[in-house]
């Protein structure tokens, strides 16, 4: 092969060619025959927005590296791709796109429009995934809005309902007034903001006194059902058994005691409202208090708010504070920072409303979830603590019903006569109770039913992803369950990870996966979360256009699981530069890749091969431990420095020499082995580049090749130590040539290497390589130190010193120095610290000398030094 047959530059535009070839040949398909050990990845199903972002890239690069690595290790890998379709954002987008409200059309039509939008978004995202070279098996694609997937979701509901793990009840729930739906506690995000702590006078009945309440939510005074203080707070002892009047609204409430009150906050007296927060819920339940609904589902004040009915929460708050001040009830306002629960989708502050909803009995399953989490391997390990801490904070059951349309229907009907709940038979699934009937007669004799209009939380869909991939509930599902790996972001540990473990334990009694690898978030180059408002968003397409998928993948692989990572153009550019460096090395190597018999490897060959075997062991271990950054950095360092900068340069003279054919063949064979091994080590991270190179030197796809074998017999620590020293010597001579403005291939007349006996024995086998690499005519090795002398061969008077200091004597001094022997002048100053000239004393400050080193043979030499071990190199130009 000649390098003319290979393009001069690596062209990342060819990536698309390989992607099409991989798809056509279906090389990533899961066989499932049982002839190979299986490896199952529980792939996260993204929400189909229509475009992927850098967070997706980071997550999928992690799992794609694992999938490719495991395939090469001999596993039959099931790497599916799913789509978590249902949810409010799609409904909002459909309303915007078609300029409608969901109430303007039938539920069926609205759902059809949502499906249509989602299908198009999936198509676009699928193309983007494929453009990044991800190796999913699209034969195992799952889509949560399809009848088959909804059947599984509904079946999981029925079985958990049958086992008493799902129930319907009237309870306080987190409610988003913007989305007009209940949300789970895990979907509440807390943000810090500034508000006012209002100090309000509450009159005491039958006394000319008052209790001062500090509250950040005066708009809930209409729903005040008690005033609570700490049992040990003596300030309120006199008000025991008295009623407290709520200003503006007039209801009289009891003063109660509870140890949860913080007597140091505000005034120590707190109003209990239904409901300001979770603590209110706890107090209402503990003390048997009434419930007043002051806020409706849309965030407006109800009839209970009296004259404030119909105002928004914010409007009501402002008006009540104004009225309290006007009527003398408001004593003061203080600014305060507080954490406010918001909806994770729209960031609207949540309310707590009492609603009839469907719940998963989370608290019954917490012990099983914790046990399963302990059995799993977490990468990084400390991420397990996040899940365990979350399970320890679970006060409420999981509210799984939503007041939306585009989601999996709850398979339930209510008898029109007696209200009895009827769940679907498993054989009927999937069903839509708003459209389908139960086909039964109620125990009361009625055949009229009302279908449940609420739908399931989308986490009810995605939390059975490992079961769906395995084919549950078919008996054969246990062949593919539990999964081996769950890759996901740390931001959804308390949702997707928690719910999946909980649901799979409830449905199967088994943990859903053996290992879980957590990726971090991707920030902008400015260190902030990527957002359009900051202008720091980088779309994957921008990188693909200029640098290709592999450069982007190298950036992602350089991060550490669990840690947030800033996107950095410099890292992408470095990855691209590395690929071009490797490509150029490959072009050179390609002209020397001839078919040779096996010949004995030379010392420099043995050095690189020993280091290569260490590389194989280290990269294999790193990938087994999901330490992607260590694996990639090690491969890049080896290829760039050990292989390209050192070994290839050190064997060029052998490749072009006809004097020793076996030496040339040994170098050629070594080049082939190192190239092939490095390509396979790099293949999981840079699949396009390695495929492109492999097509010139091998057969078939590199991704169907096996992982490089670690051959212990090739590892030789002694040859590595010796080779490292030889490489250091070559590097020192190379630096000497560079600093001397000499071409690196410029010939040197001779070189003598002086060192101790042990180091001399180490260097001896590499003398030919040192001489050949640096074009040295005669090279020798001496145990000991050289006999060298330093001689001044030129001197130059420093006029800027002599003129001002010696004035009228300066011309005579210059004249004398011009005719003097430079070395005699130099020795005189060295001996006495000065020399007398025309009655004046001159030092080294007055004269510059150019010196030469004279070697053992009496010739001028250059002397180079290495410190560890001590090596002196005497160069004759």
From Swiss-Prot:
Keywords for the protein's UniProt record, in alphabetical order: Aminoacyl-tRNA synthetase, ATP-binding, Cytoplasm, Ligase, Nucleotide-binding, Protein biosynthesis
Intracellular or extracellular location(s): Cytoplasm
Stated role: Catalyzes the attachment of valine to tRNA(Val). As ValRS can inadvertently accommodate and process structurally similar amino acids such as threonine, to avoid such errors, it has a 'posttransfer' editing activity that hydrolyzes mischarged Thr-tRNA(Val) in a tRNA-dependent manner.
UniProt-listed InterPro entries: aa-tRNA-synth_I_CS (IPR001412), aa-tRNA-synth_Ia (IPR002300), Anticodon_Ia_Val (IPR033705), M/V/L/I-tRNA-synth_anticd-bd (IPR013155), Rossmann-like_a/b/a_fold (IPR014729), tRNAsynth_Ia_anticodon-bd (IPR009080), Val/Leu/Ile-tRNA-synth_edit (IPR009008), Valine-tRNA_ligase_type_2 (IPR022874)
Keyword Zinc found: no
Residue ranges of the motif 'KMSKS' region: 529-533
Swiss-Prot/TrEMBL GO biological process terms: valyl-tRNA aminoacylation
Highest classification ranks of the organism: Archaea, Methanobacteriati, Methanobacteriota, Methanomada group, Methanobacteria
Domain comment, as recorded: ValRS has two distinct active sites: one for aminoacylation and one for editing. The misactivated threonine is translocated from the active site to the editing site.
GO cellular component: cytosol
Broad enzyme group: ligase
Short sequence motif named 'HIGH' region, residue ranges: 46-56
Official protein name in the record: Valine--tRNA ligase
């Amino acid at each position: 092969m000649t390098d003319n047959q290979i393009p001069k530059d690596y062209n990342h535009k060819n990536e698309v060619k390989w992607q099409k070839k991989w798809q056509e040949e279906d090389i990533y398909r899961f066989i499932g025959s049982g002839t190979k050990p299986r490896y199952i990845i529980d792939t996260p199903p993204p929400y189909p927005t229509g475009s992927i972002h850098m967070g997706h890239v980071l997550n999928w690069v992690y799992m794609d590296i694992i999938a490719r690595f495991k395939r090469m290790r001999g596993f039959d890998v099931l790497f599916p791709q799913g789509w978590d379709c249902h949810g409010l954002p799609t409904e909002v987008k459909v309303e915007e796109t078609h300029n409608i409200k969901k109430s303007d059309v039938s539920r069926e039509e609205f759902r059809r429009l949502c499906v249509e939008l989602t299908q198009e978004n999936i198509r676009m995202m699928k193309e983007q995934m494929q453009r990044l070279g991800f190796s999913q098996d699209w034969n195992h694609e799952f889509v949560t809005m399809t009848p088959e997937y909804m059947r599984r979701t509904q079946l999981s509901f029925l079985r958990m309902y049958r086992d008493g793990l799902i129930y319907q009840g009237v309870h306080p729930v987190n409610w988003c007034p913007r989305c007009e739906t209940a949300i789970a506690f895990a979907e509440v995000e807390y943000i810090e903001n500034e508000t006012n702590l209002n100090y309000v006078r509450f009159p005491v009945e039958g006394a000319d006194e008052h209790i001062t309440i500090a509250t950040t939510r005066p708009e809930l005074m209409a729903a005040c059902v008690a005033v609570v203080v700490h049992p040990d707070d003596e300030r309120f002892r006199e008000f025991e058994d008295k009623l407290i009047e709520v200003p503006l609204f007039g209801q009289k409430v009891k003063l109660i005691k509870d140890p949860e009150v913080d007597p140091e906050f505000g005034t120590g007296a707190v109003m209990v409202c239904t409901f300001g927060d979770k603590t209110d819920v706890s107090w209402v339940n503990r003390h048997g208090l009434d419930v007043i609904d002051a806020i409706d589902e849309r965030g407006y004040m109800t009839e209970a708010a009296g004259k404030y009915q119909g105002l928004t929460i914010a409007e009501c708050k402002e008006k009540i504070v104004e009225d309290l001040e006007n009527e003398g009830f408001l004593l003061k306002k203080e600014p305060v920072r507080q954490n406010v629960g918001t909806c994770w989708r729209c960031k609207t502050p949540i309310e707590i409303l009492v609603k009839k909803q469907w719940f998963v009995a989370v608290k019954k399953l917490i012990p099983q979830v914790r046990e399963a989490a302990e059995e799993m391997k977490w990468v990084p390990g400390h991420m397990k603590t996040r899940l365990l801490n979350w399970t320890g904070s679970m006060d409420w059951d999981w509210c799984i019903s939503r007041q939306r349309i585009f989601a999996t229907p709850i398979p339930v009907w209510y008898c029109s006569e007696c209200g009895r709940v009827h769940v679907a038979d498993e054989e009927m699934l999937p069903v839509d109770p708003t459209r389908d009937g139960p086909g039964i007669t109620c125990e009361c004799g009625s055949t009229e039913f009302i279908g449940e209009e609420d739908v399931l939380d989308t986490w009810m869909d995605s939390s059975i992803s490992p079961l769906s991939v395995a084919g549950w509930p078919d008996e054969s599902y246990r062949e593919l369950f539990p999964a081996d790996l769950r890759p996901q972001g740390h931001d959804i540990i308390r949702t997707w990870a928690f719910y999946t473990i909980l649901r799979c334990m409830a449905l199967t009694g088994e943990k859903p996966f053996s290992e879980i690898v957590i990726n971090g978030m991707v920030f902008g180059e400015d260190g902030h979360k990527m957002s359009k408002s900051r202008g720091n968003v980088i779309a994957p397409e921008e990188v693909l256009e200029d640098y290709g998928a592999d450069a982007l993948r190298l950036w992602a692989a350089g991060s550490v699981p669990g840690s947030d990572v800033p996107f950095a153009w410099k890292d992408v550019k470095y990855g691209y530069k590395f690929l071009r460096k490797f490509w150029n090395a490959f072009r050179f190597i390609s002209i020397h890749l001839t078919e040779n018999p096996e010949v004995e490897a030379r010392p420099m060959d043995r050095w690189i091969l020993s280091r290569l075997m260490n590389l194989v062991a280290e990269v294999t271990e790193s990938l087994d431990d999901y330490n992607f950054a260590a694996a990639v950095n090690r491969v890049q360092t080896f290829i760039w420095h050990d292989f390209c900068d050192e070994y290839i340069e050190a064997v060029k003279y052998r490749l072009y020499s006809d004097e020793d054919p076996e030496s040339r063949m040994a170098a050629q064979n070594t080049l082939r082995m190192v190239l092939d091994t490095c390509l396979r080590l790099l293949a999981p991270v840079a699949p396009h580049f390695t495929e492109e190179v492999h097509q010139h030197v091998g057969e078939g796809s590199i991704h169907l090749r096996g992982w490089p074998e670690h051959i212990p017999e090739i590892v030789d620590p002694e040859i590595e130590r010796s080779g490292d020293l030889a490489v250091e010597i070559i590097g020192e001579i190379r630096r000497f040539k560079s600093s001397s403005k000499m071409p690196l291939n410029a010939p040197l007349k001779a070189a003598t290497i002086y060192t101790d006996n042990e180091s001399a024995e180490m260097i001896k086998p590499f003398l030919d390589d040192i001489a050949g690499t640096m074009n040295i005519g005669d090279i020798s090795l001496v145990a000991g130190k050289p006999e060298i002398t330093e001689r001044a061969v030129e001197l130059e008077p420093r006029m800027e010193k002599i003129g001002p200091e010696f004035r009228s004597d300066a011309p005579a001094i210059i004249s004398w120095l011009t005719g003097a022997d430079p070395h005699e002048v130099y020795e005189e100053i060295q001996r006495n610290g000065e020399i007398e000239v025309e009655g004046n004393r001159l030092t080294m400050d007055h004269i510059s000398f150019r010196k030469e080193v004279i070697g053992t043979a009496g010739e001028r030499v250059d002397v180079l030094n290495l410190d560890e071990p001590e090596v002196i190199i005497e160069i004759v130009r």
